[in-house]
Amino acid sequence: MLADLTVKDFLDKVACSDPVPGGGSIAALDGALASALSTMVARLTVGKKGYEASEEVMQHAQTITLRLLDEFIALIDKDSAAYNEVFACFKLPKTTDEEKAARSAAIQEATKQAALVPLEVARKALDMMSVIADVARLGNRNAVTDACVAMMAARSAVLGALLNVRINLGSLKDRDFVLQLQTEADTIEQTACRREKELLDAVNQDLRI
């Protein structure tokens, strides 16, 4: 599993000429990094003097971020597996008309799944952004910039994942499916960019001397 590799081994694998792990897996990794970093900020808040009123919120935030961390880690491999399935379908026999039809149907179905996996990454990363906003607002002020980096990583996860959704939609014949995912992707992107801007604008204003 990709998630079991060391950081260096993972990066070396990304840098090689194989198409996986690619951008979709990296988007999931961005989500995992956002989850881990926001968990750190929450843990730096719990039990600290002056943050007693935030204790319950931070405990709840940790529950969510740790769950999402595990889910993003699984999605790193899930995205690569989805790509490999599409690639495998293109290798199916296409000698007879029946084989051609079966191959085409298999490619379409595998491509749908290859679009749905990064959409799952984008959805989860958007959910993460709401938690990060709370962690940044109520968490340890000494770690507010860490929360901002987590927010940027989550936004990167969203945008990277949505690019992978859209490139797969381009080859699908099911127009209702395509329209549904395109509409959701556009909404997720707009919301993610707004959430990131709101937090960064507020924190940058506070940090100005």
What are these regions (language model features)?
Residues 37-44:
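A conserved active-site cap/scaffold subdomain adjacent to cofactor or substrate pockets
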Residues 48-58, 97, 144, 172-179:
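Short, surface-exposed loop/turn segments at secondary-structure junctions
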Residues 16-37, 143-161:
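Conserved phosphate/anionic-ligand binding catalytic regions in large, soluble enzymes, centered on
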Residues 79, 83-152, 156:
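Amphipathic alpha-helical interface segments
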Residues 2-21:
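Short, hydrophobic/aliphatic alpha-helical segments
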Residues 49-87, 188, 195:
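A structural-propensity feature for long, helix-poor, extended segments
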Residues 128-131, 143-202, 209:
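Preference for long, well-ordered alpha-helical segments
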Residues 29-33, 61, 68-75, 114-124, ...:
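Amphipathic alpha-helix face/heptad-repeat signature
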